[in-house]
């Protein structure tokens, strides 16, 4: 496999072409952003840790029947993945009220929800990734109703697998956001990453935040939180 030109650079990753048309290399950066890019910084070795965490979790999900874009981890910062067309939706899963949902609905952070909440945001930086529903998604051509059903079914399974896996490591999975892509044959697969950048992890005993909220809210010890998550799931 030969790594070729950069195809795309986002806030946290770079995507490179390879000598295989259906495979790409994803490089994880140390750049950190919050509040739709209003706050920017660097977290030492974040890219290394997120690459390792995502690789471990995607391998676990694959073993339990979840199709992903992940092929293999290449080195500390890079992984080889299937080339996909990203569905322009972020799927947000909320098991406990926190962050923007708690603020939006006037709930105390940490409030247990009577059911898991699934939300969609439309991936558009200029618009600030607005919340939309499935009808909006279909109306603007982001996905079909059939694709939405597939995505929600996969997301529910992913949530159950991850909640159980993290509970074994004394971590509560408060909420997370994921993205999906379509392969050349139309198959929908889990894409992007699952890491402390995209999830809220709270220690089940102390309630300590072990995720990017430490950067967002200037709580300090940001790197230590990422290291702790990697340490627990690497056992």
From Swiss-Prot:
PANTHER family: MULTIFUNCTIONAL PROTEIN ADE2, SI:DKEY-6E2.2. Gene3D superfamilies: ATP-grasp fold, B domain, Phosphorylase Kinase, domain 1. It is an enzyme of class 6 (ligase). The gene is purC. GO terms for molecular function: ATP binding; phosphoribosylaminoimidazolesuccinocarboxamide synthase activity. CDD domains: SAICAR_synt_PurC. Belongs to the SAICAR synthetase family. Coiled coil: none annotated. Keywords: ATP-binding, Ligase, Nucleotide-binding, Purine biosynthesis. This is Phosphoribosylaminoimidazole-succinocarboxamide synthase. GO terms for biological process: 'de novo' IMP biosynthetic process; cobalamin biosynthetic process. Its EC number is 6.3.2.6. It catalyses: 5-amino-1-(5-phospho-D-ribosyl)imidazole-4-carboxylate + L-aspartate + ATP = (2S)-2-[5-amino-1-(5-phospho-beta-D-ribosyl)imidazole-4-carboxamido]succinate + ADP + phosphate + 2 H(+). InterPro entries: SAICAR_synt/ADE2_N, SAICAR_synt_PurC, SAICAR_synth, SAICAR_synthetase, SAICAR_synthetase_CS. Pathway: Purine metabolism; IMP biosynthesis via de novo pathway; 5-amino-1-(5-phospho-D-ribosyl)imidazole-4-carboxamide from 5-amino-1-(5-phospho-D-ribosyl)imidazole-4-carboxylate: step 1/2.
């Amino acid at each position: 496999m030969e790594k070729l030109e950069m195809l795309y650079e986002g806030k946290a990753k770079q995507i490179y072409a390879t000598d295989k048309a259906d495979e790409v290399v994803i490089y994880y950066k140390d750049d950190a952003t919050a509040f739709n890019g209003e706050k920017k910084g660097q977290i030492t070795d974040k890219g290394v840790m997120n690459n390792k965490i995502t690789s471990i979790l995607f391998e676990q999900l694959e073993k339990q029947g979840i199709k992903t874009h992940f092929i293999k981890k290449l080195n500390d910062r890079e992984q080889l993945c299937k080339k996909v067309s990203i569905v322009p939706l972020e799927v947000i899963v909320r098991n406990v009220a926190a962050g923007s949902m708690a603020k939006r609905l006037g709930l105390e952070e940490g409030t247990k929800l009577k059911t898991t909440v699934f939300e969609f945001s439309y991936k558009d930086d200029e618009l600030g990734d607005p919340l939309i529903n499935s009808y909006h998604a279909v109306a603007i051509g982001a996905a079909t109703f059939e694709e939405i059903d597939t995505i929600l079914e996969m997301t529910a399974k992913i949530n159950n697998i991850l909640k159980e896996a993290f509970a074994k490591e004394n971590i509560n999975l408060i909420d997370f956001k994921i993205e999906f892509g379509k392969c050349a044959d139309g198959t929908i697969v889990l894409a992007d990453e699952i890491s402390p950048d995209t999830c809220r992890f709270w220690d089940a005993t102390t309630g300590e935040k072990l995720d990017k909220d430490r950067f967002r809210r200037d709580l300090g010890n940001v790197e230590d939180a990422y290291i702790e998550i990697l340490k627990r799931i690497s056992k």
